From Swiss-Prot:
The keyword Transmembrane is assigned to this record: yes
GO cellular component: plasma membrane
Physiological role: Part of the high-affinity ATP-driven potassium transport (or Kdp) system, which catalyzes the hydrolysis of ATP coupled with the electrogenic transport of potassium into the cytoplasm. This subunit acts as a catalytic chaperone that increases the ATP-binding affinity of the ATP-hydrolyzing subunit KdpB by the formation of a transient KdpB/KdpC/ATP ternary complex.
Chain's gene name: kdpC
Organism: Caulobacter sp. (strain K31)
Record HAMAP family: KdpC
Lineage: Bacteria, Pseudomonadati, Pseudomonadota, Alphaproteobacteria, Caulobacterales
This protein's name: Potassium-transporting ATPase KdpC subunit
Lipid bilayer topology: Single-pass membrane protein
Top-level taxon: Bacteria
Subunit field text: The system is composed of three essential subunits: KdpA, KdpB and KdpC.
The family this protein is said to belong to: Belongs to the KdpC family.
Annotated transmembrane regions: 7-27
NCBIfam families listed in its UniProt record: kdpC (TIGR00681), PRK00315.1 (NF001454)
Keywords: ATP-binding, Cell inner membrane, Cell membrane, Ion transport, Membrane, Nucleotide-binding, Potassium, Potassium transport, Transmembrane, Transmembrane helix, Transport
Amino acid sequence: MLSHLRPAIVSAGLFTVLLGLAYPLAVTGVAQAAFPAQANGSLVKDAKGTVVGSTLIAQAFAKPEYLHPRPSAAGAGYDASASSGSNMGPLNDTLIKREKTDADALRAENPGVVIPADAVTTSGSGLDPEISPANARFQAPRVAKARGLRLAQVQAVIDGQAQGPLLGFIGQPRVNVLTVNRTLDARFPAHGQKGG
């Protein structure tokens, strides 16, 4: 009977070591060597080395001198542990009321301007760190006014941070909210704050 169990035990032990230890270590090693920033969460640090965010996860920016991310289905604080879509269909009364309230507030701030869809709709995860270039341009006048800048200065930062579709055809053009806001702080500190 032991002769029948021995191959099974050896196979289980071998595959445990191979797939539970060797393979994960190899993948981690390759990732750390080839893509260290991405392998460690695409973290963004300030001048002192303190982590201030990640380019992969949205965070709340409510002040007028900053671009604002998309609304979050994960709560007001963009809580990653609550990440998910709202599962509300397009005819859901709660969703319609929230989007109308958000659109009315944006319309009051920007009369006569077309509101981009992603300014009032959540992403699938609720934590999308990027907005459309149209949404960034929509917010640029508010940011410029709050920082005492010309609109062209803010637009130049947005254009400099804009990314096209992956490989030229996958996805949509996008702007990372955190990187634009960090660049604005570095180049044009708002109301006496230190850049960086």
